[in-house]
A protein has these predicted regions:
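Residue-level detector of well-ordered alpha-helical segments, enriched
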Residues: 59-66, 103, 126-133, 145-149
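A long, hydrophobic alpha-helical segment
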Residues: 43-55
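Charged phosphate-binding loop/patch that engages nucleotide di/tri-phosphates or the phosphate backbone
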Residues: 142-167
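Extreme N-terminal tail/first-helix region
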Residues: 9-45
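Hydrophobic/aromatic-rich, well-ordered segments within soluble, folded domains that form packed cores
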Residues: 53-88
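Amphipathic alpha-helical segments within well-ordered protein domains
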Residues: 51, 92, 134-135, 151
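Mid-chain, well-packed structural core segment of small domains
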Residues: 93-137
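Short helix-capping/linker segments at secondary-structure and domain boundaries
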Residues: 73-79, 138-148
Length: 167
């Protein structure tokens, strides 16, 4: 009986070990320390791909949260929370960042230059996120780049939830 119990325990330990090996990586956990470095790290490998997809007129991989960020409180997934901007000050810092601001302007320009609609490029859910992002940065930027995307893609209509969160 004792041998059977030990064998069963060993089998359970092996199964647990292999389940750990095969388990998918969990989504990032929300954190209190919101350094912009989280965006730089996330964009390191994916930004060139994201830009290529927008220029080709079709988003096919998953990068919307850290390429076109929106305010925290609009999305409920771990990624939306983790990459959500805390407010207008963090949005200003994002836009002023030498890497992040340059990339956001570049990929936003690619959206403007596309002959595709936002829905064709991003699909329904991510089009909503794009509108939130463009609304936020149109409030922050001194130029009209982000407002021009709102005009082109959303008939000039800002995202009301973003404006509400901004106060």
């Amino acid at each position: 009986m004792e041998l059977i119990a030990k064998t069963m325990k060993s089998i359970k330990e092996l199964l647990a070990f292999f389940k750990k090996k095969e388990a998918p990586k969990p989504e990032p956990k929300p954190r209190l320390d919101h350094s912009l470095e989280r965006f730089v790290v996330a964009q390191e490998l994916m930004y060139p791909r994201a830009l290529e997809e927008v220029k080709n007129g079709r988003k096919v991989t998953h990068w919307i949260w850290y390429i076109f960020p929106q305010l925290k409180g609009l999305g409920h997934s771990n990624k939306s929370i983790y990459y959500g901007l805390d407010g207008i000050e963090e949005a200003r810092a994002f836009l002023a960042h030498p890497i992040l601001g340059t990339r956001l302007r570049e990929i936003t320009t690619a959206v403007l230059q596309s002959d595709k609609t936002a829905d064709e490029i991003f699909g329904g859910i991510d089009t909503i996120k794009l509108r939130s992002c463009m609304t936020l940065f149109s409030e922050v930027a001194e130029d009209d780049l982000f407002g021009r995307v709102l005009l082109k893609c959303f008939e000039g209509k800002s995202d009301s939830k973003t404006l509400e969160l901004l106060g």
